[in-house]
Each structure stands twice: as C-alpha cells, then as structure tokens.
C-alpha cells in the first residue's frame, strides 16, 4: 500500500466531518471505506442514532405527535436498529432513554429556519458537505442544533479543561464548520451552537467563540493535508471500536486480531 500514491484521489474528494473523524478513528478503516469504497455493515450505535434522528426530524417536518413517534419507535425499532448492543444493560439503556425522550418531546426554544439543512462550502479549495439537524432563530439570533445520542456534558468552566470539556470541544468542531455556510447565507455567524443530547436528556447551548471558529477552520485544512499525505493507512486495533463501531469489520484483515487483544 505504501508504494501507491492516493493523494490525487484524496485531494479530489468532497469532505465531511464524519469522513475526517473516520480517519482519526482508524486510517485503515478510512482506506477501506473511502479509497476502496466498500459498503459497510449496519451496526447498533450508528443505526440507533439514524433512527432517532429520523423520528426527531418527523416531529418538525411532518408534525408527528409524541404518541405517533412512540408508536413508530416501538413498532419499527427491531427493523430499523441493526446489529447488537455490547450487552443487555446498554441495549436497555438506549431503548428506554429513546422512548422516554419521544414520550416527553417538546419543541426547541427557537423558531425553525430549516430542518436537515444541507450546507456546502469551499475552504481554501477544500469542498465540504454537511447537514444541520435544526437551524433556529430567536430575537434575531441564529442557533445551530445537533441531535446527539452521545451523553455530552456542559462545559465546566474550570481553569483547566476537564476530559468532558475536551470531548465537548471535539464535537463542537463539526458545528463550527457548519457555521461557515450559515455565515455565508445569513451574513452573520450563529449566536450559539447546541447539542440536543436526547438520551440524557440534556440540552447544551454553547456560546459562539470566534477563536474556536478560527481553530476549526485550521483543523479542517490541517486534517485534509494529513490524510492526503498518508501512505500506510495503518489499523488502530481497539477491541470495542472494532467490534461495535467499525462498519468495515467484514472486510478488515485485522478484525480477528483486534478481538484477541483484550
């Protein structure tokens, strides 16, 4: 693999936050998916998140009631959520928390501007594509909302950032990148970036930071350069990620080995 130059192919790609994060998780997984273009399998966490996103979207775009959403959740869960959770406790937690959120669902505190809004832009010649789950407005201010199955924590505001602060910042990068398109369309950046952590349930509203915005743009350019210059695409063999998060496991020569390294 090291003697083949994939840079022209990589430079010609349209980028997304998930495409870059896939490389950070495992360069070989990225190679299988985006260079060899193999079709991955549906797994529990990803398909659960997709199912919940579709139901929340239907609440706003189709006017579905809580009762209708709960009925769909119960009747279609087995069909729409593929794979297996790591254990029964995790399955029960995800299933129950999803149902409870839909049972008590209520509108975000903003006037909807767009649902599942497609965003496209170029940054230093890099084409980028994404989708904003919910774009809202309140008193002239714009808010970007992302629905998350991940249980993020609000910023602690401690002098030294905690691990949960760092995790929040890593997820905020995606919304800062989406803000490039928002600024291009509306002439101003969002006032806040928000996470609807529906399993908690917790709604996090993070004030927009111009410095973090600048750093996110730099991150995009830096990561694309890093991926374009990659030649080895080495695997990152972590038991949990390989077994429960990697959709390429059926094609991966390292998968069996990753399951032994516990």
Question: Residue locations for each model-derived region?
Answer:
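RecB-family 4Fe-4S metal-dependent nuclease core
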Residues: 1-262
């Amino acid at each position: 693999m090291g003697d083949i130059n994939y840079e022209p192919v990589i430079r010609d790609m349209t980028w997304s936050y998930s495409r870059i994060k896939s490389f950070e998780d495992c360069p070989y997984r990225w190679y299988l998916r985006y260079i060899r273009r193999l079709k991955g399998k549906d797994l529990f966490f990803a398909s659960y998140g997709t199912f919940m996103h579709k139901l929340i979207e239907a609440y706003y775009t189709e006017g579905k009631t809580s009762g209708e959403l709960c009925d769909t959740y119960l009747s279609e869960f087995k069909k729409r959520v593929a794979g297996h959770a790591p254990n029964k406790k995790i399955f029960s937690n995800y299933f129950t928390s999803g149902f409870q959120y839909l049972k008590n669902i209520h509108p975000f505190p903003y006037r909807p501007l767009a649902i599942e809004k497609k965003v496209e832009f170029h940054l230093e010649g890099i084409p980028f594509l994404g989708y904003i789950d919910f774009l809202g407005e309140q008193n002239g201010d714009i808010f970007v909302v992302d629905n998350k199955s991940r249980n993020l924590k609000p910023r602690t505001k401690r002098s030294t950032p905690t691990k949960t602060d760092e995790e929040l910042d890593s997820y905020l990068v995606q919304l800062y990148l989406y803000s490039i398109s928002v600024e291009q369309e509306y002439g101003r950046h969002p006032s806040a970036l928000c996470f609807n952590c529906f399993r908690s349930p917790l709604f996090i509203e993070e004030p927009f930071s111009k410095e973090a915005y600048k750093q996110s743009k730099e991150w995009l350019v830096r990561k694309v350069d890093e991926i374009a210059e990659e030649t080895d695409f080495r695997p990152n063999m972590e038991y949990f990620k390989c077994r429960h998060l990697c959709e390429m496991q059926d094609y991966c020569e390292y998968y069996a080995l990753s399951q032994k390294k516990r």
